Amino acid sequence: MGMDMIEMIEKAEILMEALPFIQKFYGKIFVIKYGGHAMIDEKAKNWTAQDVVLLKYVGINPVVVHGGGPEINKAMEKMGKKPEFVHGLRVTDEETLDIVEMVLAGKINGDIVSKLSKFGGKAVGLSGKSGRIILAKKKLKKIKTEKGEEIEVDLGRVGETVEVNTELLEILINNGYIPVVSPIGLDEKGEAYNLNADTVAGDIAGALKAEKLILITDVDGIMDDINNPETLHRKLTASELKEMIEDGRIKGGMIPKAESALYALEHGVKSVHIINGKIPHALLLEIFTEEGIGTMITRD
């Protein structure tokens, strides 16, 4: 048997490994939070878009939620707008929100829709304002002062989700479209707010009762030591994850991801996956192989 034939048989075996997963997840909803390096690097953008389109073609229903990456900071610099901070926390004033909306709902959302379309997907760009998908309210951040007093800080147009209206998303999903959502919400008065994309992804996954929430980031998953890949947790339960937040092993940008995972699991999502978008076809490797490549979190 020649090498070409052996390679072809190996390819067939890889496809067969995916079959039980395709059968299991057929017709189910996956909410994918697209962020980090995968949004910047051209190759990684293509891998992610191809993976999302493939999911749709094998009968899975992906919903993409994206953040701003470094694009917002770049746009602010170009426009000569300096970030404002109160007690170390960034404030989103009217002018900043205009820039955030322009970058999120304009440039980034449009780029993702174009990539998905390039590979044969029917993608529709939305913001949380579209069809009032995300009802939001102002978020007041509680912090401790140097004197140990707890105070509430007004961060301007920074909000949190009150409710997710899934009607428009469900119409699009049921008609073969891939919704691509930017994390801007409206309050009851029609005022817009900038929301954390990880949190919005968890909120949408919970509201849609998605099978999976998948968070694409720049690290392999949840690790005890960020510099040591061998400390990666392949599988965690919700209570183990809570413990890691409480004892400080999860910190920085991983905190909103972990909190989003817990919220989603509490609201009916079966499993949450945190994966590294720098790995070629990370989405497919996580979903369609037995061992996966990132961290999978499930209910207790």
UniProtKB/Swiss-Prot annotation:
A biological-process GO annotation: L-arginine biosynthetic process
Catalytic activity: N-acetyl-L-glutamate + ATP = N-acetyl-L-glutamyl 5-phosphate + ADP
Pathway: Amino-acid biosynthesis; L-arginine biosynthesis; N(2)-acetyl-L-ornithine from L-glutamate: step 2/4
One Pfam family it belongs to: AA_kinase
MF term (GO), any: acetylglutamate kinase activity
Positions of substrate binding: 68-69, 90, 194
Keyword ATP-binding: yes
GO cellular component: cytoplasm
Keywords per UniProt: Amino-acid biosynthesis, Arginine biosynthesis, ATP-binding, Cytoplasm, Kinase, Nucleotide-binding, Transferase
EC number(s) from the headed UniProt entry: 2.7.2.8
The organism's place on the tree of life at top rank: Archaea
Transition state stabilizer, annotated site positions: 33, 257
Location of this chain's protein in the cell: Cytoplasm
Xref: SUPFAM superfamilies: Carbamate kinase-like
Family of this protein: Belongs to the acetylglutamate kinase family. ArgB subfamily.
Function noted in UniProt: Catalyzes the ATP-dependent phosphorylation of N-acetyl-L-glutamate.
Protein name: Acetylglutamate kinase
Naturally occurring in which organism (per UniProt): Methanocaldococcus jannaschii (strain ATCC 43067 / DSM 2661 / JAL-1 / JCM 10045 / NBRC 100440)
